[in-house]
């Protein structure tokens, strides 16, 4: 389909629009969508836990995160994929000790939005009040930051690895999609990006 193996990573904090954009881009370009959050949720469900409980378990069990990373790296090696997750860019770039290798990413994207906007989005999506959404987001982010620093020695809030950082609160969903498409299209037309 493409003249290159396409590996696009999309990261961002909860409620920033990563899943929405990853799904839309995967559908638009005919790419697989490998979603770290979905893998994590499935693992939580398998253990009969909600995300908060499982996040706490994951703090003491690095094998959970390492398994997610391995699955994402395998997908990156197969190519023609959108990898979604806070560490997806690190995984695709081969930056983590257990998934070392060449940088396979065609484009590394980070989506962001202010906490209040993200809390409103999560509240709407999950049918909870905004205050509860804010609390859950902050708890999850705290847990993840701790895990990522302890397990990998990386700070996922360091955005220097990303090619494109976009504040999704400034544009509508369709406008955000158009901006991302405008960044991706030229890369897919080139033989050697």
Swiss-Prot record:
Full protein name: Cytidylate kinase
CDD domains per record: CMPK
Principal location: cytoplasm
This protein's UniProt keywords: ATP-binding, Cytoplasm, Kinase, Nucleotide-binding, Transferase
Domain of life: Archaea
InterPro entries from the UniProt entry: Cyt_kin_arch (IPR011892), Cytidylate_kinase_dom (IPR011994), P-loop_NTPase (IPR027417)
Subcellular location: Cytoplasm
